[in-house]
From Swiss-Prot:
Function: Involved in mitochondrial DNA repair.
Cellular compartment(s): Cytoplasm; Mitochondrion
UniProt keyword annotations, A-Z: ATP-binding, Cytoplasm, DNA damage, DNA repair, DNA-binding, Mitochondrion, Nucleotide-binding
Record's protein name: MutS protein homolog 1
Record-level GO cellular component terms: mitochondrial chromosome; mitochondrion; nucleus
GO molecular function terms listed in the Swiss-Prot or TrEMBL record: ATP binding; ATP hydrolysis activity; ATP-dependent DNA damage sensor activity; double-stranded DNA binding; mismatched DNA binding
UniProt feature coiled coil, ranges: none
Length: 941
């Protein structure tokens, strides 16, 4: 007859289900029935009176429940859950993201339904984070097992699963895929609250639109990998240039902006393809920043910082703290960027002059940065990039930099020695940040010690120059920190670290192989787990550690290591005793499943009997035909002592390493000064090398309005031509000298007009970063802004034609250029009819001549402008030309700028060079003679 009983079913490692099922019991079935007596069936029994049959409720296993909860909580993220040695995705995320990562999507069977899942080994996390965060522009949440807080009594489990960090492009810290040569900024943009209440952006008067362009904006940005923190007051018309200069990896906007998708600012940011995040703007007092800062905010910052900047900073810090979850961000005190401190290079100029990337394919190769960058350290390269995007306007600062470059140029042997030492140095900025955020390791400590040694050597090399003002401040900041170096070297065992690295690589290979087996066959995971549980190790190997801290560093470690050696001696003695009594058939072993036991190879029952006689306390717990396993109290006690001693050594090492780390970070102020000094040396020596190799000259940088360049060259073009063994044709330029501040340049296409315009703007930029310049002589008066109107393209995203883009850029220049600005304009008015274009170009020239008074290079094909501007006393005409061989009708460009006007643009010649069919050229030549206001072309025959 049926009765009922509880059945327990294992659903997962930490989950059981309990149900009542029918069960027929036979009375006395546990005993042998008497002869002739049949078993008596037990009467029908029901479930307990208080039992109420529950409704069948099918639920997910606890792990998947937690995953589902976290996916809802972090709805904007791809959730990666660490399970054993894997990071896994589940449900729809596995189906959508798995194929993008080239991962196999499988089904995990549950009582509720089959659940999609995909995963990868934990040591490949950086590889897949790069794809998710950098390539796919996804936000990633990492869920891992962490120790349950003491006050959390919701479960008896020691560990809970929690999201430990949310990773976005702007919140990277020490990931291997970070570009070490570029800053990793996250930027918050906060607009004036009234900005979105008006619609003057799309309609209204010109004055209304000017008000719109002047709308106040607060900016705040930081690099978590270095702790650098900045704020700036800006406005809408400068925002594009600010974004190009800062080049953030991520922009944080107020969530209310999501509802303004038709607003111009939304499309303005969207079209630049930044990674966007949205949060609620927060305004708090500056006091709330202090708990995240290394030291208190400078009073001058508090005095000048605007409310919008404070809001941007509060929003950014709050966002960072939320993304880091349990980690504490460590940030340097904020620096307020003032427009008066650096040369402003707008978005158009940054692109047109190819400062960071080439116009062709938008690549690093072919850019100005690529042409001049000879730095040998990662942090030096980052600093050079920042300076190139925001050259200084401080004459004293510029000349101090030039002094350093000149000294190293005059002392090439010293320069070479310093460079060779810098090549061996490590990224102090990012290493220190790792330590400050509690993410450092023993390798970081050794790298820091290496930097101290290198600093001491460099300091020794430069000491004879201490009397020079150029080196005095550098040497003051280059503290070698001998005591910290000694502390690290006394503690950290470098050889052990190397062995540890080798062991980790070997373990990684094993895990990778097992992972591949699991991916190929789902049942392989069970076999691998069984294998790991039953595997047996050599005792010395199982207790062997590549200890990070030297055993003689302090008394505690010395005693613990002595105790460990004593325990190993006891182990050897016990093993020797076993061997004497039982031979080599008996060994002391340890395994995850059996813990500490004695393993016997059996040759008959006498072996077991002999063992029991010799070791009366031994307990047999497992045997086969050929082996037997015994628990021996003496070995169990010894094994536990070994384990505890090993644990105590590990704890003491962690205490020592933390103590050393705390000591290092307590010197963070001087260490940051040291890092800055090494960066300064890297840039100075690299620019000295550049000047030596490329024949650059020291410019005179002063407070005048002069731009005097003799035999100037374009560094990017010159570098490209040198690969083809073609010499670059240099040219002079004199604007801002005396009464003349505008050069009106005519000449044919391909004759070098645009190159000439760009090279002079670049020479100003190089001079103000503290570099020598490509010329035989140069005098540069401080430039406050560089404006460039060279080449435009349709902006289909905002439904603007090429001509409209050109006119907007021109309008921006005319409204913002000052007497200290340097303006280059090429072919203004080319996007409309000839007469309209000439009229617009003339109007611009007149405005620049009478209102702006900027140093200006103005190139045009409209030679009529030279006649229209004859009355302008501050305008001079220069031209380029080409040479024609009358015998064979060939021509070539001489690229030399001469005083005068070229009335022929030779467009047909350039068309011929481009391969335009002969008949087309003849027809064009014929009709050209019939058009009014044209010059007679050179014969094509």
């Amino acid at each position: 007859m049926p009765t009922w009983r509880y059945i327990f079913s294992l659903r997962s490692k930490s989950s059981f289900t309990k149900t009542w099922v029918p069960f027929t019991q036979i009375r006395n079935s546990s005993k042998s029935p008497k002869v002739g007596q049949k078993p008596i069936l037990q009467g029908a029994l029901g479930p307990p009176l208080d039992f109420i049959r529950p409704k069948e409720k099918v639920t997910l296993p606890p792990l998947l429940k937690e995953v589902s909860f976290q996916q809802k909580k972090f709805a904007d993220c791809v959730l990666l859950t660490k399970v054993g040695n894997f990071y896994e995705m589940y449900f729809e995320q596995a189906e959508k993201i798995g194929p993008l990562l080239n991962l196999r999507v499988s089904k995990k069977k549950t009582s509720k339904s089959d659940v999609s899942m995909a995963g990868f080994p934990f040591f490949k996390l950086d590889r897949y984070l790069k794809i998710l965060v950098e390539d796919l522009k996804k936000c990633v949440a990492l869920s891992e097992e962490v120790i349950r807080p003491v006050d959390d009594l919701s479960s008896k489990n020691m560990y809970i699963r929690s999201v430990t960090r949310v990773i976005t492009p702007g919140t990277l810290i020490d990931e291997n895929f970070m570009n070490p040569y570029e800053s990793n900024y996250i930027l918050t943009v906060v607009f004036d609250p009234n900005f979105f209440s008006s619609d003057i952006s799309n309609q209204g008067t010109a004055e209304d639109k000017d008000c719109f362009a002047d709308c106040k904006i607060g900016l705040s940005w930081l690099d978590l990998s270095t702790g650098e923190f900045f704020t700036q007051d800006s406005n809408l018309q400068r925002l594009a240039g600010d974004l190009t200069r800062i080049s953030p990896r991520e922009i944080v906007l107020d969530e209310s902006l999501k509802s303004f998708t038709t607003h111009p600012i939304y499309s303005f940011i969207q079209e630049r393809k930044y990674f966007l995040s949205y949060v609620e703007n927060r305004y708090q007092s500056l006091d709330c920043w202090n708990k995240f800062l290394e030291k208190e905010i400078d009073p001058s910052f508090i005095k000048y910082c605007t409310k919008l900047e404070v809001t941007a900073g509060c929003t950014l810090i709050s966002y960072i703290a939320d993304r880091l979850q349990n980690s504490h961000p460590n940030i340097q005190p904020p620096i307020r960027v003032s427009l008066n401190e650096y040369m402003i290079i707008g978005e158009s100029a940054m692109k047109g002059l190819e400062i960071r990337s080439s116009l062709y394919q938008n690549r690093y190769t072919g850019s100005l940065l690529h042409a001049i960058n000879k730095t040998v350290t990662k942090s030096g390269s980052r600093l050079l990039t920042r300076r190139l995007c925001a050259p200084s306007t401080n004459i004293v600062e510029i000349n101090n930099r030039l002094d350093l470059v000149e000294k190293f140029k005059l002392l090439p042997e010293l320069c070479s020695k310093v460079i060779n030492l810098l090549k061996k140095s490590n990224d102090t900025h990012r290493i220190l940040q790792h330590l400050l955020m509690g993410r450092g390791n023993s390798y970081d400590l050794l790298k820091m010690a290496d930097n101290f040694s290198i600093t001491k050597e460099i300091h020794s090399l430069l000491s004879p120059l201490e009397s020079s003002s150029a080196f005095r401040l550098l040497l003051l900041n280059m503290h070698p920190h001998d005591e910290l170096k000694q502390l690290i070297n006394n503690a950290v065992d470098e050889n052990a670290l190397m062995k540890q690295k080798i062991n980790e690589e070997e373990e990684t290979e094993v895990i990778a192989q097992e992972a591949e087996e699991i991916l190929q066959d789902e049942n392989a995971q069970v076999e691998i787990v069984k294998k790991s549980l039953s595997s047996e190790f050599d005792i010395r190997q199982s207790f062997k550690e590549n200890w990070v801290v030297k055993s003689n560093f302090n008394n505690n470690l010395r005693k613990l290591h002595e105790k460990l050696q004593s325990l190993f001696a006891s182990y050897d003695k016990l093993q020797e005793d076993l061997s004497k009594r039982l031979g080599k058939k008996a060994t002391l072993r340890k395994s995850p499943a059996k813990l500490y036991y004695v393993h016997l190879k059996l040759s008959g029952n006498e072996t077991i009997e002999r063992f029991i006689k010799k070791f009366t306390q031994a307990v047999l717990f497992q045997s086969t035909k050929s082996t037997a396993s015994f628990q021996l109290p003496g070995w169990t006690s010894l094994g536990m002592d070994l384990e505890n001693t090993k644990l105590h050594i590990h704890q003491e090492e962690q205490r020592v390493l933390k103590s050393i780390t705390d000591e290092i970070v307590s010197h963070h102020k001087t260490l940051r000064s040291l890092a800055n000094a090494l960066d300064e040396l890297d840039i100075s020596t690299s620019l000295a090398t550049l000047a030596q190799e490329q024949d650059f000259v020291r410019p005179v940088v002063d407070d005048s309005h002069a731009h005097t360049v003799i035999q100037g060259r374009h560094p990017i073009v010159e570098k490209g031509l040198s690969h083809k063994l073609i010499p670059f044709t240099p040219n002079d330029c004199f604007v801002g000298n005396g009464n003349v501040n505008i050069w009106l340049i005519t000449g044919p296409n391909m004759a070098g007009k645009s190159t000439f315009l760009r090279q002079n703007a670049i020479i100003s930029i190089l001079a103000q970063i503290g570099s020598f310049v490509p010329a035989s002589n140069a005098r540069i008066g401080i430039v406050d802004q560089i404006f460039s109107r060279i080449g435009s393209a349709d902006n289909l995203y905002q439904q603007k034609s090429t001509f409209m883009v050109e006119m907007m850029e021109t309008s921006f220049i005319l409204k913002n250029a000052t007497r200290r600005s340097f303006v280059i304009m090429d072919e203004i008015g080319r996007g409309t009819t000839a007469s309209d274009g000439i009229a617009i170009a003339y109007g611009c020239l007149k405005y620049l001549s009478t209102i702006n008074h900027s140093r200006t290079l103005f190139a045009t094909h409209a030679h009529q402008l030279t006649n229209l501007t004859k009355s302008f006393k501050n305008v001079e005409c220069y031209c380029t030309n080409l040479s024609i061989d009358r015998d064979d009708h060939t021509f070539s460009f001489d690229y030399k700028l001469k005083k005068g006007v070229n009335y022929q643009s030779h467009g047909l010649k350039v068309a011929e060079m481009a391969g335009i069919p002969k008949n087309v050229l003849l027809a064009a030549e014929e009709v050209l003679t019939l058009l009014p206001n044209t010059s007679k072309p050179t014969s094509m025959k």
